[in-house]
Structures are given as C-alpha cells and as structure tokens.
Amino acid sequence: MASLENPAIDSSSEFESSSEEISSSKESKPKEAPVTVPSTKTLNSPSAAVAVSDDSESEKQSFVLTRRKKKEGAAESPAVKSGKKEGAAESPAVKSGNNEGATESPAVKSGKKRASEGTTSRDMHVKRIKKEGDNKKGHAQRVWSEEDEISLLQAMIDFKAETGTSPWDHKDRFFDIAKKSISFDVSKVQFFDKIRSFKRKYFGDRKVRSVESDHDKKCLGLAVSFWGSDGVSLETPVKKKVKDESVLVKANSKEKNVKPLVKEDEQVVILGEDSEWFEESFLVPVIASLGLDEYSVKKKWSKVSVETKKRIQEKMKLVDAKKCELLLANMDVLKEVTSVLTQTN
C-alpha cells in the first residue's frame, strides 16, 4: 500500500513540477503589452478594460500635446524674437524710406541748385557784361594821362589865340593839329568827348569844382583861360547871308522901301565867356554912361583880339583878388570892433 501510494505522490509531484515549468516558461516569454489591472473585477468586464485603455491613450495624447506645445512655445519664442528683429529690421527699412525721401530732397535741392545756378550764371553773365562795359569805360577814361589832358587844354588855348576862332568851328583842322601832342592814337570822338568832359568837370557845378589835386588845379587854370571864369566860351561870329532885297511895307496905303534887316555877310555876335565876365563887370555900365549904348559896347568888345581880352581879364582877376583881400580886411576890422564893444561895460 505504501508502495502504491508513493507512485501517486510522485506523479502528483511531477505534475506540479511540470506545471511550474510551464508557468515559468510562460513567464520567461516577453509580454507584448503589459497592462496593470487594478482588480479582478475589472478583468471580468470588457467595457471597463476598454475605458481604461481609452483613458491611458487620452493621457498619452494629452502628454504628447503638452510636450508638443512646450516645444512649439520654445520654438515660437525665437520666432517672436525673430519677428521683433524683423520689425527692427523693418524700422530701418522705414528709415531707409525716409532716407529715400531725404535723398529725394537733395534731388529737389539739386534741382533748385541747378535752377539757382542757372539764374546765378545768367546774373553773373549780365554782371560780367556790365563789369566789362564799366571796365571799358574806365579804360577809355584812363587812356588819357595827366600830360595828355594838359596838352589838350593848352592846344585849345593856342588854337584859339592863333586863329581867333573856337576849335568847334574847325574841328578837323584843330584835331589834325592837336592830336600830335597826344600820347596815344586818339579818335575824333574821343578827342571832343574829352573836351566836353573838361567843361562838365570844371564848370558843370559852379559852386563846387573838382580841384582836389594839383593836376586838377592846373587843368582848372587852363580851362578858365579858355572858357573864362564862368565856363562860357566866346564863339566865333556867325555869318548869316541874307539876300539884299527890299521889304515892302504898306503904311497908309503907300509902299515904302525898307532896308534889309540883316545885310549880307553881316556878323551876328554870339557873346561867350569872355564877354560874359565883361558884361558882369562894372566896365559896361561905366562905358555906357559915357555916351555909348550897352549893345554897341558889347559888340565892339566881341571884336577885340583874344590876347587883349586875356590880358584885361587877368587884370580884372587881380582887381577881384584885391577886392577879396579888402573884404577880408574889412571883416577883420569889424570882428575886432565887435569884440571891443562887447568887452566894454
């Protein structure tokens, strides 16, 4: 009996060992998807197992989404920074746009400058022309040296003394004679313009005369010798030819023969500077008081030679100078008497 029971026990033990080997072999196999089951009850219901699997998947998805969002957030922050940088880069672009506007303003300025340059160039051209014209005038005026001016005035005096006529009556003759004493090749227009300028300079304003320099004083003396103290020259007597014809005048129904008003070749006297100082002097009324009328006195004076007139005029200047000295002496006496009277109580 004992022997029979032992094989059974052995068989049972062998069965248990074989079952343990099978279980160990099962445990040794890798599990594909181990799922933790909280209780046996959950295993018994398939809906509960599906819910557990869905929750785990949703948790996984939420975890993945949160991870992804974090990664995207970490990736977006540089993007935002890059956006800011792009904005910062755009601001220079805007600035560059403004700079383009600023660059356009120089273009406008350049256009204005060009326009101003055009106007200024025209103005400069006009000014240059005016300046050249002024320079030409100044050059034409500077052509005459001091020696030339004195030579011209002296030639005028000599011509008038030799011929008894004015240089204006014989321009060609006077020009041919006087131009030899000029240091440059002078034209006739320049020649007589210079004579006119002398008269304007020294007799244009009788109150103020250009006598600042010694040269002007010398020229003024020569000009006075030619034109006189008042700048009115003795002109050459002008001959007017009038036909010797009778003028019929009816008076009381009777015709009377009247002599011509002006005879042929009769000289009409034009009184000039030499006659003017003579008329303004005391000589004319004194001589007229002796029995001659003033017209006859003036007419006879116009026929006197230039040398004689000049000599008498110099004497009159001495008389005038003595008159001035006498007047100054009278003024000194008057001043002294006035001062004495004011000091006397």
UniProtKB/Swiss-Prot annotation:
Tell where it localizes: Nucleus
Q: Where is the composition biased (Basic and acidic residues)?
A: 23-32, 114-137
Tissues showing expression: Expressed strongly in leaves and flowers, weakly in roots, and very weakly in stems.
Keyword Transcription regulation among UniProt keywords = yes
Residues bearing Phosphoserine are S105
The record's listing under InterPro entries reads: GEBP, GeBP-like_C, GeBP-like_DBD
The keyword DNA-binding is annotated on this UniProt entry:
yes
Q: Segment Disordered: which positions?
A: 1-145
User: What cellular-component terms does GO give this entry?
Assistant: nucleolus
Q: Which GO terms describe its biological process?
A: cellular response to glucose stimulus; negative regulation of gene expression; regulation of DNA-templated transcription
Q: Where is the composition biased (Low complexity)?
A: 11-22
In its UniProt record, a GO molecular function of this protein is: transcription cis-regulatory region binding
Any idea which UniProt keywords this protein has?
Answer: DNA-binding, Nucleus, Phosphoprotein, Repressor, Transcription, Transcription regulation
Recount the UniProt induction comment for this entry: Up-regulated upon glucose treatment.
Which residue stretches does the UniProt record annotate as biased composition, category Polar residues? 37-46
The family line of this record is: Belongs to the GeBP family.
As for what it does, the entry says: Transcription repressor that binds DNA in a sequence-specific manner, 5'-GCCT-3', to regulate the expression of PGR. Acts as a modulatory component for the glucose-triggered developmental leaf growth process.
What's the protein called, per UniProt? Transcription factor STKL1
- Organism this protein belongs to: Arabidopsis thaliana
